Amino acid sequence: MNMDKSKYTRNNFHSSLLKQIIIRVDFSNITDLNKFILTIKSTDWIRECFQSYRTIQANNFNMNLSPKVFEDKVIPLSVIETATIHRFYECKIEPVQSDVTLDITDTFTSITIHCNDTYKSINPYIDCISNIVGELFTYDPFTQIQRIAIRKIDGQDFENEDAVYEVFEKDKSANSTLIEGHARLIKKSYTDAYLDTYANIKINLSRSMEVLLENKYRYVLDIDGYIDTSLNILNNCRDKQGIQDILQFRTNEHLFCIFKDNVTKGYLDSGIKDHE
């Protein structure tokens, strides 16, 4: 049902569905990563955000991933190449979440947030990663931003299919659990990739519903919004404020509009009541 949902905003609504957020900025290769990390570690704001630091060897992250996070609680990695990741953890940003990490490599920085019930806002995390990129512009004025992205994964388990559609819009996915004959649904998923010409942002939108044991249902909504070099926006992004504006006002606001389009008005009403 197409209903007006404009009254629901990020300021008056709180979602209980949000499980994980990834904020990521890709850039041209840093010449001396270790020296840049020392610069970051010397700042006051990083010590206000994170308590601990370590290096790890891992495969580079790939943002084009299948939505399995709700079950595994982690983002799976696609193999590209082995890289050193400088990881800041034990996040001190209030309210403290169950697991938040800041990763920096020679080609990207990302913040991964595993959200708990006390999660309130993405803004302090956007501010943190914008500080990183702002320091990078100062450290190396020749740095070129190649991609800016936010990915949000919402999901919940339900007792039955009717309960699913009290939260998620039914017309956003197939309606029947019966395929044909005696065949019954195990899992269905839909992924759309498109360019939103109004916001000038690329979107990967995945919706999946899986039948679990005892005929319970798991629904996952996975929204990835990003801006890359093909959109001719990043060339003018040369400071912290530019990064912050793209993440907060262009990308995150648009992801919230997509989220609203995929959940019911009844659920949005309950979110306002809970928030108040």
Where are each of the predicted segments found?
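Hydrophobic alpha-helical segments and helix pairs
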Residues: 91-137
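Long, compositionally biased interface segments
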Residues: 216-276
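Short glycine-rich, low-complexity/disordered patches
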Residues: 51-79, 138-156, 179-182, 254-276
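Aromatic/basic-lined ligand-recognition segments
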Residues: 10, 82-101, 105, 144-224
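Extended intrinsically disordered, low-complexity coil regions enriched in Ser, Thr, Gly, Ala
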Residues: 33-55, 120-144, 231-251
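N-terminal low-complexity, intrinsically disordered segments
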Residues: 1-104, 276
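A generic structural motif
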Residues: 29, 113-122, 156, 227-230
